[in-house]
Amino acid sequence: MSELSTLSNHLADAVEAAGAWTVRVQARRGPAASGIALAADLILTADHVVDPSREDAIRIGLPDGSEVGGSVVGRDPATDLAILKIASGSLTPARAAQAEPRTGALALVVARPGPKPNASLGLITGVAGPTRTRRGGMLERFIMVDAVMYPGFSGGPLVDAEGSVLGMITSGLGFGGPAVALPWSLVSQIAETIQKHGKVPRGYLGIGSQPVTLSAQAKELAGGQERGLLVVQVAEGGPAATAGLLQGDILVKLDGSAISNADDLQSLLGPNRVGSSVSGSVVRGGELRELSLTVGSRE
């Protein structure tokens, strides 16, 4: 057998292996999408393929060809993840890859938009991040792959040449260009939070802001920091208003960490911050002031 035939058979075996835990998800009008078995009764899929108006009519196509009903455990639109549950508990959970994704490595997108698995082959073109999604989520990392994304592939696994999962593929993050997958380590963390809370709590101060360059005086007050966030709006009754933050203040630090733009602020307002008290350093009227804020939860 030639080396090419050996490689071809190896990749086909990888698709077959991944197909054992890849399911069909019919949760919207139009074509079905795909999902990944997290546990015997839990499925991970892309949030954008689950129509909120059809949550009571979800159908899951299993690898053995049967079909069962599904329900929503929770979802996180910001990272395009949703978790579904089936009653039968008959799924084979996905096998995670032991190695981190490598740029230049072969990878397969496996999907089940119909009764049988489909696949697309490509190269991992890069592992990038952090970046913010169009829905406001912050991704520490994401995987880019040049495989073709056919209809119904969103929610399916990106697997290595052994058929072990590297991440979940999705077209719902709005990046354009190559296909994008969320790394399995990140997906697993978010999935755990969704299972506990039904969503991913995100910190909220209740301000509208824009980045500004600090004046020489403000820069000195901020310890040499060159930029900050000008508060242009304060939500009535929100955490910032309760703490006494005012329109026109310049927020320069949160718990001692410099804030130069909105991404800096959001990175400091993760799920673990919700409900906690933080110290905000603001420049106001030529003075540096410290305010104590209780981080709220963004609904």
Regions found by a protein language model. Name each.
Residues 19-21, 82, 86-94, 118-177, ...:
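Active-site region of chymotrypsin-like
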Residues 32-33, 153-155, 229-231, 246-247, ...:
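Short loop/turn microsegments at loop-to-beta-strand junctions
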Residues 38-39, 160-161, 255, 284:
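A cytosolic small-molecule/anion-sensing beta-strand core signal
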Residues 152-157, 213-222, 235-253, 268:
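PDZ/PDZ-like domain micro-motif
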Residues 40-44, 166, 240-263:
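Conserved PDZ fold ligand-binding element
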Residues 2-3, 22, 27-118, 142-143, ...:
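Conserved active-site neighborhood of the chymotrypsin/trypsin-like protease fold
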Residues 1-15, 109, 161, 165-226, ...:
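C-terminal cap/linker of serine protease catalytic domains
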